[in-house]
Amino acid sequence: EVGTWRCRLHGAGHIPGAAMVEIETPETRILWSGDIDTRDSPNAGAASPVDCDILCLEGTYGGRHHKPRAEEEARFVARILEVVSRGGTALVPAFASGRGQDILRILHKEVPNLNVHYDGMGTRVTKEWLGCPELIRDADRMVKAFRWSKRVTGKSDRKKALDADVIVTTSGMLDGGPVIWYLNRLRHSGSNAIMLTGYQAEGSGGRKLIEEGKLPIFGTLTPIPLEVDKFNLSNHADHEGLSEFARSCNPKDLILFHATEGGRQPLHTELAEEMTVYLPLNNEPITIIPR
């Protein structure tokens, strides 16, 4: 509590610990979503709607729809097995907090016989996660998956990992980290493959790999003649999830943020008849006047 204001945190479903912020004043109630997912993922439970007067909602995937998560996870595992069956290594670039841990959970559950190595900042982040088990969905399973993986802690471990079935490592957008070291060595064998499971921003190494088949490696733009597969394992709600979440919060006013113009407009079109929708630009101040 701050004076007559009260603040509460609610699980946002994006990653463990991600929170929506509810601000209750004597005149109005505001909910700030942050990054949210309205579906369960391996390590985080879905965000639940919170009744409010003003909803500030992310629109990352406005106008876009996700395939069912179970379907996409099954496609990911099947592709991993295909690469391993031909004697290759599947390299999975992963974000340090969220995606890497989800990948470990999926692999531990579906293909526990595989030799999976875990490298990069994600190993340290996971240890921090495990210090707050109450925030992790089925925390015991995350503990088991982490212990099951072979953590890379030095150069000798990294060389051993080149013979693994799967390498999960940072960075998720191929802009640095151990993934560059692995790519430089695995690129020489066509039996290996790269599995992209996260968004690749414009200008990132991952985007360059997708569009040009090349990547900067230690200062040199290098061809990467490996198969590159993309999987949508996003921890953001899609258009339908965002729309239903907004309706269930029952706000009078909706403020959309973190969205492209192509994402904001479909949400505006769908929800404008049910609530007042604002589309502010970056650096544009908004004054909230209770009504």
Task: Identify the residue ranges that each predicted region occupies.
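Glycine-rich phosphate-binding "P-loop"
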Residues: 57-74, 139-146, 223-237
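Short acidic, glycine/proline-enriched helix-loop-strand junctions
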Residues: 265-288
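Active-site neighborhood of phospho(di)ester-bond hydrolases with catalytic His/Asp-centered motifs
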Residues: 9-12, 31-36, 56-60, 91-95, ...
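Hard-cation-handling environments
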Residues: 77-197, 202, 257
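His/Asp/Glu-rich metal-coordinating catalytic cores
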Residues: 1-115
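Proline-aspartate-enriched helix->loop->beta-strand connector
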Residues: 246, 250-256
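Redox- and metal-dependent alpha/beta enzyme cores, enriched for Fe-S-associated oxidoreductases
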Residues: 187-223
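A short, acidic, amphipathic alpha-helical segment used as a generic capping/interface helix at domain edges
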Residues: 177-186, 234-248
